Amino acid sequence: MASSSSRTRSSRPPSPASSTSSSHLSNRLIPRSNSTSASSLITSAAGIASRSMTPSRTFSDSGLIGSGSFGIGSPVPYPSEELLGDPMDDTISSERDSISVTVRFRPLSDREYQRGDEVAWYPDGDTLVRHEYNPLTAYAFDKVFGPQATTIDVYDVAARPVVKAAMEGVNGTVFAYGVTSSGKTHTMHGDQESPGIIPLAIKDVFSIIQDTPGREFLLRVSYLEIYNEVINDLLDPTGQNLRVREDSQGTYVEGIKEEVVLSPGHALSFIAAGEEHRHVGSNNFNLLSSRSHTIFTLMVESSATGDEYDGVIFSQLNLIDLAGSESSKTETTGLRRKEGSYINKSLLTLGTVIGKLSEGKATHIPYRDSKLTRLLQSSLSGHGHVSLICTITPASSSSEETHNTLKFASRAKSIEIYASRNQIIDEKSLIKKYQREISTLKLELDQLRRGMLVGVSHEELMSLKQQLEEGQVKMQSRLEEEEEAKAALMSRIQKLTKLILVSTKNSIPGYSGDIPTHQRSLSAGKDDKFDSLLLESDNLGSPSSTLALLSEGSLGFNHRRSSSKLNDENSPGAEFTQGVMTPDEIDLLVEQVKMLAGEIAFSTSTLKRLVDQSVNDPENSQTQIQNLEREIHEKQRQMRGLEQLIIESGEASIANASLVEMQQKVMSLMTQCNEKSFELEIKSADNCILQEQLQEKCTENKELHEKVNLLEQRLNAVSSEKSSPSCSNKAVSGEYADELKKKIQSQEIENEELKLEHVQIVEENSGLRVQNQKLAEEASYAKELASAAAVELKNLASEVTKLSLQNTKLEKELAAARDLAQTRNPMNGVNRKYNDGARSGRKGRISSSRSSGDEFDAWNLDPEDLKMELQVRKQREVALESALAEKEFIEDEYRKKAEEAKRREEALENDLANMWVLVAKLKKDNGALPEPNGTDPGRELEKSQSHAVLKERQVSSAPRQPEVVVVAKTEETPKEEPLVARLKARMQEMKEKEMKSQANGDANSHICKVCFESPTAAILLPCRHFCLCKSCSLACSECPICRTKISDRLFAFPS
């Protein structure tokens, strides 16, 4: 444990690559131009009306932004700064690259410490992950972070280059992958103390906008989740079960809601609202485990301002939090098990797609097998930069899951991508041309009015005057229409300009003399949004504190979200345009003052409420009270600034003439300042490089000193060994020889034991063959008995039918005799002799005595004899019916016994299939086991047992030999049961050995490892893992346990 933990503390020295790239980037910082026309603003904002676009999974990376962020290495190379410096080039750049893979270890949890888990995987340096118990098993990645690393460190390496390149027109995607409870959601979202990748990326986006003058930006966000293969819109609770569509640009989600964001707090408020609708649940590892994949998409549109405008650059930044794959260790049931099966299927499909892409062959890639892979199709197919963050746990209890995650990351590292910049070529370049033509025409018109054009005759002037009068009527109507259109256009410009974000850096107060009035007000409105952000960051001390305050406002106080949004939209900047202001602009400032006054009143009431509540919990409420007081002071300062602007607006018109000269001087000073800052940045970068080189030299010097000391110690040890007597060497060699002899003896004993076991198994197999032959003979005898019983049943049935016919006839005759006895008069004399003769003649047919007409009167029927004969027939009929019922009962018992024998036969087949797998393993360990004449003893044993059961039951059903049946059972049972018991005991021992050899075998191994519903029914080849049901084994192309390709499958019947 101590050795493994010490290995995690190693870190790589900072790379100078990022510092140089940052220096190149700052070279292209230019002052912002405020001469953007109204028509260009309309066209740039018109991109909002386009259809909803889904996150395009493409990625971009580049160096770090700003002059103060040096020494952070980029895991993969990115487009050069010279290419990124000219975003409006008609040629689209592309560069062959690979997916950036970063691995982050989380520390052991308290539960894992209590359970006694040890460190099974550890980071070996900055790029290697190595197994503790098998050091030869290692994986190399772009960057590996130990448990002590912070989320900011991970963001600087894995996500910051992607975010920066996305702001320059290259699509980017960052997603976290790992098993459940490995720290994916913590890495992507974080908390108040340690923000995650998504909050840091949002903050970085707005800081890049601040540092990029001369460009205007439009930001939109969308937030969706994939829950049980159903896409839901987290920003719109009514948007459920959305569909995925495809067009020329790639895949997108139809009907997804997109929101325009104006500040980091605004964007974080949408994330907080979406997280309230996300599906979470608890399991054995995590109290709040993610049950769905989420995709947060930031769409960026940017264009250059002023005369340099050439088109619009569009890019998408996708930040994905995948749900963790689950094993049977989570012990989920019901809905949680169903959710886990959907998560595992989507992640298994993602692994299959990554595997096929890593092969580089022209094969079918199953993107459509899952909603996740279909949405990631454009990213994985290589149209942008991709950054994969794999979160793993070092615990020994999850060693196999960690190994699978590392295999997945290693495959993803080999996928090639081609990052390219997106560009929207629209009609804006034509609008610029038209505007230049209009300006030249206006110049000519001014020259005509001043009479600067000579050589025009009186006749030409009269004709021109006549044409002018004719066109006045038409122009009047057109002018009215244009006025109406202009009013509508102005209102639309004011609305759309509020959504466009620009930088306030290097903006000069009052530099708006050549800009139209409405354009000046729009630019001021855009400046206000970001000036307020700068003021907040200056007051709070650092950008991180600003982000924490904004996230607190969006998460902790929902009632303040609307007021914060209004403050972001309407708060004035410290550098508001101070030129000649129109009454509309002054009214706008007055309205902003009123809104600020209302927000101050609302914040004051909130502060009073918090002060009242702080009596119960003063510690937690103290920070909120301080933040509110700071916010109230800031808004009061902004309101005073607005009032000062209103007062100074009148004075600005007087000093307008001299202000232009001052602005030119300030501009020249600003350019000089930029040059000096650039030189200073280069000097600081060189200084950092020299410091890094000095540190490297120092470390090399220390290593050389350590090597010298080590060599001196070895030299002393060698000299002492040479001086020691040779008897010690002999003693050591003798001890070593004794140890070798003991090992050889123990191995010989083990070999003898294995040979004895082998002989016993062969004897047991021969005994089982003999029993199979006996049981086969008994089965044939049982079949003969069954056929004889069937023939006898048929005979009995025919006899019963005959007896029933005779019974009906006798009943009819008895009824006729009774009728005759009632009609006849009683006779006085009885002839005894005749009666005896009549009784002897009744054994024949009675109808024959009725044939003689002359003796009919002398006929006398005895009803008692008839009753006795009828009773005898009834008794015989009852006996036959009871015999038939007994036969049917015996036949039912035979059927039940046959079904039970079939069930036992199936159970024996499964047991013997497992036994033969174990026998095959024994063959590999102890040598080839001789095959018994091409016969299958397992199959014979099953048949023999089933035949024995049939024979026992048939013999037991025989009515004449009950004693023989008991003797047969008692004789056969002692012969069979010991052999079967020995076989079962041997199989149980082999199973226990196999379970002990596997360090992390699943407790519920009889359940499918993908769907967690059906029992396992397939043995996968060549890995021989019995872990999937029949349907999942046909659907999967690789084993979910060891990730090896499935070449064939053996299906078994569950017992």
Curated annotation (Swiss-Prot):
SMART domains xrefs: KISc (SM00129)
Keyword NAD: no
Residues that bind ATP: 178-185
Low complexity bias (residue ranges): 1-23
PROSITE patterns to which the protein is assigned, alphabetical: KINESIN_MOTOR_1, KINESIN_MOTOR_2, ZF_RING_2
GO MF terms, alphabetically ordered: ATP binding; microtubule binding; microtubule motor activity; zinc ion binding
Domain of life: Eukaryota
Composition bias type Basic and acidic residues, residue spans: 937-954
Region (Disordered): 1-36, 826-856, 926-963
ZnF locations on chain (RING-type): 1008-1043
Record domain Kinesin motor: where: 98-415
Coiled coil location: 419-503, 618-653, 694-823, 880-911
GO cellular component assignments: microtubule; mitochondrion
Transit peptide: 1-96
GO BP annotations, alphabetical order: microtubule-based movement; regulation of defense response
SUPFAM superfamilies in the record: P-loop containing nucleoside triphosphate hydrolases (SSF52540), RING/U-box (SSF57850)
Protein name (Swiss-Prot/TrEMBL): Kinesin-like protein KIN-7D, mitochondrial
Native source species: Arabidopsis thaliana
Encoding gene, per UniProt annotation: KIN7D
